[in-house]
Amino acid sequence: MATGIAAAAPANSNIATVALNATLNESLTVTVTSGTSINFTLAPNTAANNGSGTSTVVTSWSLKPGRNNIAVWAYFTSAAAALNPVTAGNTVTIPSSAVKIQVNGAGAFNPCSNVSPFNAAASGLQIGATSITGNTNINGARTDTLAYQIDTTVVPQLPADSYTGVLNIQAQTTP
């Protein structure tokens, strides 16, 4: 004889939740991946003393909506003294206008003599610009190759000495 056992209906628990929060921080970075030290053998009163190599500059970004442009600049902290003498008693400096940069192997070598957004000295050169168009390139990167010259005709009485300086490379996005 068979007895009927009724199947029990499923029982559901309450609903538990987990809140998920994710943040992608805005970033704009510049890295010199090669050519972090450039040497020059200078000749007096010579317009084109070439640097020993090139620098590769990578600018990468992850931006918030509303940004519309990225500008990459090379600049010195002083227009009058981009490179300073090593020898005590030598007070002659190489100005930023004597340092010239060619970008990506094309066009002229241009002096570092413009005002950058990073300091008021007329010691900079914009080396790149990227327009941001909506969300099509809000995350991206650009690579620029810089070649260098020092024009010693800018300082016709430049004494024999070693001269050292630091070229800053920085990017800015707007607005």
Go through each PLM region and give its residues.
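Sequence contexts marking disulfide-bonded cysteines in secreted/extracellular proteins
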Residues: 111-113
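Signature of long, low-cysteine stretches enriched in small and polar/charged residues
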Residues: 115-127
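Bacterial N-terminal signal peptides
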Residues: 1-3
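N-terminal small/polar-rich segments of proteins
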Residues: 7-109, 129-175
